[in-house]
A protein has these predicted regions:
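Bacterial Sec-dependent N-terminal signal peptides
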Residues: 1-22, 209
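Extracellular/periplasmic carbohydrate-active domains that bind, remodel
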Residues: 22-416
Length: 416
């Protein structure tokens, strides 16, 4: 009887919404979410009149970052209203809008219209990307079907299901990491926020997906290790830990990452995606903002490069990259692998790339697009094509190095 009552209440509520409002869905910040920063809230956003929740963080330079997402049905006309708490003196759109139209309505309001789902748009207001007010908006495709409530493991589909709400993994399961293997899955529904780490280990067809978010202030957020034919799609990753790579693909093949939104603006060693000793992977339509490498392709180990695996057949496309430190797209610096080959970085936007907030202009081994080889190996069949760069300290860097980070990492160019 209770389920019937809830269903009727939902139907009645939908009946009260305007037709266009039923084509979108927003989710509130769940009760218990622990990482809201005590910062000025410069933005208020509504989507077809529905309030959109904004999460926040800060830049190294004291600027503010707000970000949020909503869902819409593809092909439907949708209007997003962005209101500022102060007059707009400057407005920069990153990248140039492709899937939406943006116009300033008055001195404190911006209107965005679209009929296409699955896009990402950044607004920089009243300042530069380092110190201004930055808003990252993410438009996701509407998740159809009945969404889960609470947490449960669905045995027939081998899926961990998280409905809307806040979940502390350690309190929920006794461990801060949820690991799946084989062809198991983890689904984060819209409005689900999981505090912990999600991991695929020894996977074959495993998947982490959904429009929810994973966050923590301790370690990496998503890892794929020793796996084949696995995928991570659509989730938001918001890191608060220092010296922890956000997303790692390690010793794996045929891994696909698509539609992810990845954040950690805290200095440093907080790479967005690290691909380590892995091949035949695809990274598509992701937004990555990190206070270190946005993307790094590495060969790690104590072996000679000639004894390592080949890092080959990697595809990166339709990305938006923002690095407050190091590189937007980098190969290295650790290059303990037999070769790097058949790597494609195409049709993407580098929104902002800066060398280092503390050691500005003192490090010459970093750039928006960079190859920094500490260990002698071979590079061939690499393609950088159709890349729009909006802000960068240095566009391209290529070099074989004897050491890295003030001598803390020693290089060896013998190749043995």
């Amino acid at each position: 009887m209770r389920n019937i009552t809830l269903l009727l209440a939902t139907v009645l509520l939908l009946g009260l919404l305007p037709a266009k409002a039923q084509d979108v869905r927003t989710s509130p910040i769940p009760t218990g979410y622990p990482f809201m920063e005590p910062l000025p809230r410069h933005f208020a956003v509504t989507v077809e009149g529905q309030e959109m929740a904004l999460y926040n963080d800060s830049t190294f330079w004291g600027g503010t970052i707000d970000f949020g997402s909503f869902e819409m049905k593809d092909g439907k006309d949708v209007t997003i209203s962005v209101r500022l708490d102060e007059d707009i003196h400057s407005l920069e759109l990153l990248p140039k809008p492709k899937d939406c139209k943006v116009r300033q309505i008055d001195k404190r309001q911006i209107e965005i219209t679209t009929r296409k789902a699955d896009w990402q748009q950044t607004l920089v207001v009243n300042g530069c990307p380092r110190k201004g007010h930055v808003l990252h908006l993410f438009c996701n495709r509407y998740a159809e079907g009945t969404q889960p409530t609470g947490y449960r493991y669905d045995e027939p589909s081998k899926t961990h299901l998280f409905g809307p709400g806040y979940y502390d993994l350690k309190q929920l399961t006794g461990a801060a990491t949820l690991t799946v293997s084989g062809n198991q899955k983890i689904y984060l529904a819209p409005g689900a926020v999981v505090n912990g780490k999600l991991s695929i280990r020894d996977g074959n067809g495993a998947k982490i997906y959904g429009n929810g978010m994973v966050c923590n202030n301790q370690t990496s957020m998503v890892t794929v290790d020793n796996s084949i034919h696995c995928a991570v799609e659509d989730i938001t990753v918001h890191g608060h830990a220092l010296h922890a790579w956000q997303v790692i693909i390690g010793s794996s093949r045929n891994v696909r990452m698509k539609g992810m939104k990845i954040f950690n603006p805290h200095y440093a060693s907080v790479d967005g995606i690290d691909i380590v000793n892995s091949s035949h992977c695809t990274i598509d339509s992701c937004f990555i903002r990190a206070n270190d490498d946005a993307i790094a392709i590495k060969g790690l180990g104590n072996h000679k490069p000639s004894e390592g695996v080949a890092v080959t057949d990697l595809r990166f496309s339709h990305l938006q990259l923002w690095n407050d430190c190091n590189n937007a797209f980098g190969i290295g610096a650790e290059t303990h692998c037999r070769e790097y080959s058949n790597i494609r970085f195409t049709d993407s936007d580098i929104l902002f790339s800066y060398d280092d907030p503390i050691h500005h202009n003192n490090l010459n081994e970093r750039a928006a697009m960079n190859i920094c080889s500490l260990h002698g190996t071979f590079f061939h069949d690499l393609l950088f094509e159709n890349i729009d760069v909006y802000h960068c300290q240095r566009l391209i860097g290529l070099g074989f190095r004897q050491d890295f980070w003030f001598g803390q990492l020693e290089g060896d160019q013998t190749g043995e």
